[in-house]
Amino acid sequence: MYICFFFSTFVAQMGNIIQYIIEFLLYGNQEAANLVGYTSAESDWEKYRVVVVPNGQLGKNIVVPDLSDVYIETITHDGDERRFVIHTDIIYNTFFFISRAEELINPQRDDHGRFLAQYSILGENNRLMIPTVDEYARLLMKLLGLQLPTPSFSQIYLTHDIDSIANYRHLRGAIGGLMRGQWRAVFSSQRDIHNDPAFTFSWLIKQDKKIEGAKCIYFVKDTAGKGYDYPQYNLAGKDFAMVKQLLENSDAQIGWHGSYYGGKVIGPARLHRSHYLRCSIDQMQNLADMGVTEDFTMMFPDHVGFRLQTTRAVRWINPKTMSLTNLVLHPLTVMDCTLSNSQYMNLNEDEAYFECQRLIEKVYQNAGELVLLWHNTIITNEGYHRSLYPKLLNLLTETTHE
């Protein structure tokens, strides 16, 4: 009896996952989803306008998907009625990418325990800049005779991780500044936090207001400040109170910036991004179990591109348990330090702008979400990010008014 119960539960789970993926590919069109079948039984093909033939792996094994050209067979019924049979399992392939299943069969990780683009089949096959899942969606919609989504941004998120409020308001930062001979900067910061080079919140708020309708989120830490979580800042202290007041006055939202080492959620946090973009599948399930409903971590730290192979927010499917969770993944489009850091892409400003332009165009053409991450600590007079960020915001304005 128990075996029958668990089997029926698993079958129901699989049915929910398949239905969700089909509806996701059709941009939520439930009526059109009923015209799509996922079956290898030829006797059932006549029930559907489009049939996707399973590769037999979904819910059984995790295998590397076939990324060659999609093979479509056209069948004519009663002389003129046509149906299409897709012999490439785009349902499984979609599952593989949006669930992060590749990480279960590829053990490679960097020193921070992260799965990098260079380890992925996406990096190996130069497909990082191609949202394959959205291409499947467009193909399916064309076969069903549906209108393709109008180019647009379904939402723009301008996000900022507050790894540190100030450079010189904590002991190690102040001592380091003094040892480097930056006496004036240190004492100026001690007198007034607004003078600290990392206290760039007013500037960020002013820039972000250029994008009408954008949602602005600042992810804050509540950690012991040890190791890679250093430096600590006190959420009950007066320095953070200044930041919080600025953010509240600007109508920005506050999310939880998860510890490098994992940990509890700050209060009733709904929005989350992991520090160092470090979030394993088990950690992601912990987030779902703790009540986090929206995550903004999903990007490879070492290269920009579409880690989930979609430009759109998607509910996470746990590939270990084959369960459809309520945790929504918002694909991160661009992170500042990925562009400029020498251990990552190491681009100059013109090269970085070009790569961002390519990504923004892909998101716009697929009516996806655009999510930018710029740290308050990187917007200084050093480097090019204080120049690049406004240029990208201007590009967004131009794109939305085309």
What residue spans do the PLM features occupy?
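Short, structured secondary-structure boundary patches
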Residues: 238-240, 268-270, 292, 313-321
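His/Asp/Glu-enriched short active-site or ligand-binding loop at hydrolase and phosphoryl-transfer sites
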Residues: 291-318, 334-338
